[in-house]
Amino acid sequence: TAWTFLKAMQKCSKKREARGSREAPETNFPDTTEESAQQICCTRDSSDSKSVPRSERNKKGIQCQGEGSSRGSQPGQFVGVTYNLEKRPTTIVLINDTPLNVLLDTGADTSVLTTAHYNRLKYRGRKYQGTGIIGVGGNVETFSTPVTIKKKGRHIKTRMLVADIPVTILGRDILQDLGAKLVLAQLSKEIKFRKIELKEGTMGPKIPQWPLTKEKLEGAKETVQRLLSEGKISEASDNNPYNSPIFVIKKRSGKWRLLQDLRELNKTVQVGTEISRGLPHPGGLIKCKHMTVLDIGDAYFTIPLDPEFRPYTAFTIPSINHQEPDKRYVWKCLPQGFVLSPYIYQKTLQEILQPFRERYPEVQLYQYMDDLFVGSNGSKKQHKELIIELRAILQKGFETPDDKLQEVPPYSWLGYQLCPENWKVQKMQLDMVKNPTLNDVQKLMGNITWMSSGVPGLTVKHIAATTKGCLELNQKVIWTEEAQKELEENNEKIKNAQGLQYYNPEEEMLCEVEITKNYEATYVIKQSQGILWAGKKIMKANKGWSTVKNLMLLLQHVATESITRVGKCPTFKVPFTKEQVMWEMQKGWYYSWLPEIVYTHQVVHDDWRMKLVEEPTSGITIYTDGGKQNGEGIAAYVTSNGRTKQKRLGPVTHQVAERMAIQMALEDTRDKQVNIVTDSYYCWKNITEGLGLEGPQNPWWPIIQNIREKEIVYFAWVPGHKGIYGNQLADEAAKIKEEIMLAYQGTQIKEKRDEDAGFDLCVPYDIMIPVSDTKIIPTDVKIQVPPNSFGWVTGKSSMAKQGLLINGGIIDEGYTGEIQVICTNIGKSNIKLIEGQKFAQLIILQHHSNSRQPWDENKISQRGDKGFGSTGVFWVENIQEAQDEHENWHTSPKILARNYKIPLTVAKQITQECPHCTKQGSGPAGCVMRSPNHWQADCTHLDNKIILHFVESNSGYIHATLLSKENALCTSLAILEWARLFSPKSLHTDNGTNFVAEPVVNLLKFLKIAHTTGIPYHPESQGIVERANRTLKEKIQSHRDNTQTLEAALQLALITCNKGRESMGGQTPWEVFITNQAQVIHEKLLLQQAQSSKKFCFYKIPGEHDWKGPTRVLWKGDGAVVVNDEGKGIIAVPLTRTKLLIKPN
């Protein structure tokens, strides 16, 4: 062997004996109370190593330390050490409680103890006859003796030979008992690395390592030592500034797995086009006699990483309580989680397999990640090709484990079960837990969707319905009986599923499409030998798509799928007629092409659409309308021959009333040709384009049934309240006409003439009202206000001319007392009222409590402001200006549509044609605090320069500046500039050294700006500024071609971000920010004015019966006043619920 040197010479020098028997220092004595694992590592050279990790069957082993090892073992280590074969791999073990330095020799069959070491043993056993061994000089005499070997808590009792040799040898007999195993390092030198580059202007990640628990830290150290000994990682250099955090998880087997968070590194890497766009499908395989499926083990660990890129993959192993300095490592092979690892691996393996593909073009060789499928005809040829395949892989360093080599059917491949005659989806039982969450249901739906290609007829309609309204993954869903029944039916179909067939390129394919009772479209791809594959698609009724439209789009999906798998488009057999297809094609501008179709019969519930025509008929015309009045829905219609009908519907929505009006008109009309005119765009759009999947349980079903009974029906839509005569009649017919009857008593109330409104109130006795005086005039009048009405006491014009102001106010339904009238003389002379004189009036009005919506200042109408009949294409003239605007400032589509009055679809098309804006994506989502004058700040790097940017959380307004250095002084100057321009109240940053520095903290305290810090890169603390960081960089890159310096590009990018993209409510961040600041100033002025206000009022809050006040009026408008309520603070109260008065004494 490589390390057994035996001599027959009897003389041994004392110097050699001393060398063979020397003891290790006390600090390196093995800890016999601690359990660990043994690993013997042998390297072919200084960079490529072989290792012996602990045995799988022995979880406890020994730890070894070599005399010339490149890294010695330390107490507490769990795996072995890498040895450089330029020196002997030695370690210290306890033999009969005597520490001895021994040589690890994996080539020696038997362990041999030197005579010198035997004489040094603390206690020696009997001598037995030994077996002769042959050395360099001939036979060597030996004898055997019983020994006890201890290493790291492992005790072994055995016999060792004793001979006069240079060094004690531990051979395979003892190493095996200690749990040692020889493993070659998997990093191949035969494979050339691929060059990896960072994006221009980016830097590697510098994310600090987060703390790890003691258990996970031990697991990380164990895994790192194993990777280090196998040559997959190496120590990082001292000048490496990069770092990506790691974490470890425990697998089901109990072993630890080390993972690294490389998301930030992935953002900086130049990524090419995806070369693996999907999984191969067994339905596209050509039938063959013999198959072989093999797996490539540790694929990523076989391919070396670009040496120049390795520093960017650095990671850190910390210690508990900072017991020792951190240890840092870098990857030498492709790391898991790296964005380019799949691409490099697949591209490398593709190049290795390319000579085989060219040599045997008739063999089916499928490569997906580490799974390979080989199919051919003829057993000998198959075997020969398999050997060539294995050699092509092994000579490059890849491994194909024997336990994963499948040469006997059935073969497991990518979740499928393959046999020479047919294929199946690997069977699984679909189960659901007792109280499922949204995550459980989504997993179940994913399994059903996966299995639907191999098990025709699987459905998810009722299962998917249980997830409606659920947003959180851990939210409990209501598992219905329909869903359970559907699950049981699917399990029965899976249980009885038959094997599907392979593709025959000599025959044509047929796709049969059907619609289930749950309105799911299912399809199967067939040939004469049977079904190749199947699929399903839930029809999108919620998008207003008809059945024909759903199915025609399904045909394009299946055709694309078929071309992808076998390179051909099948012939389709569909359940609708040619007339229906042609009718849909007239309106279906979205169809790119139409495949060859075999028509069978009409589709379910869709024949009524053929009755709808595009031109008016010669039949009767009916104008329909629906609405709400006093909370009650009303449906009505007016016919062209003068007939009118009205129907009260109770508490329904406005849209339901419009639909019921159309239904009522169709039901009452016996004519076979009908014209229906409605002002409800909702109803017209649904009937002409949106329906088609309705059943008897759907509210639209009666309308569909009535249309079926007609010959032809024409539906038209007109805008409401535009002076169209028929629509006006229908609108009047939908109104409830009724008289308001008032019950009253008293002598001071008089009825008016029939043409006048309300009642007059009279003076009970003579009264003199001095100038600027206010008097309350009582009357004996009592009234009972009708339901949904209120009484309004107001003045008369004849009294107003004299300067008499009446502050009577509102009388609610519940008020039954006498009416009192508050009068104020605002004239220049005294006013005398005579008994019986009419001085005020009482008017009874209906009360409407409709909710009010905020006015939309940004609402865009393509019609313009000229009203009905003014539609044109005037916005076409603005397209060029909008294109120029976007080219200069990269403005968002909504802002373009608002500023240039063009349709949003046109604005989106302008944006999509921009090469810079099409690269943008959405930022990471998070939940952060948003409020006016609350800012977030962060530093970012671009073109080796530092950009400090501030983002106002409420509006998204960005302020940015360049820093010469990322230190406290430069940051403080930038904060002073920011505070001078704005009025910030609070600032949130990460824990960067420049933000937590004492000068910066003291400056923010001096400016009275609340400062908080959060975890860097955490979406719940830095979400807004991280998204702004990404947006700002993208806009800077958009302007770099037109600028000479980064400073100029930054300023242009700020204009684009703040004034060229939409924020809340469709406004730009600048508009939202200015509006907020103006509102703050307005509120301050309002409070200042309130202090000097002389107006007071009584007021009543909606929903409460008692009047409150008198209180100061903070502000009075045309329809409301603002007061400071004790319970609710500053609120607005409608004028109808207030009684204004002069400041009380």
From Swiss-Prot:
Q: Tell me which residues make up the Peptidase A2 domain.
A: 100-174
List residues of the Reverse transcriptase domain: 230-418
Family per UniProt?
Answer: Belongs to the retroviral Pol polyprotein family.
Tell me the segments the record calls region Disordered: 13-77
Bias (Basic and acidic residues) ranges: 45-59
All residue ranges annotated as the RNase H type-1 domain in the record: 616-739
Q: What is this protein's record name?
A: Pol polyprotein
Q: Where is the Integrase catalytic domain?
A: 920-1077
Q: What Gene3D superfamilies does the record point to?
A: 1.10.10.200, 2.70.40.10, 3.30.70.270, Acid Proteases (2.40.70.10), HIV Type 1 Reverse Transcriptase, subunit A, domain 1 (3.10.10.10), Integrase, C-terminal domain superfamily, retroviral (2.30.30.10), Ribonuclease H-like superfamily/Ribonuclease H (3.30.420.10)
Q: Which GO terms describe its biological process?
A: DNA integration; DNA recombination; establishment of integrated proviral latency; proteolysis; symbiont entry into host cell; viral genome integration into host DNA
Post-translational modifications: Specific enzymatic cleavages in vivo yield mature proteins.
What species does this protein belong to?
Equine infectious anemia virus (strain Wyoming)
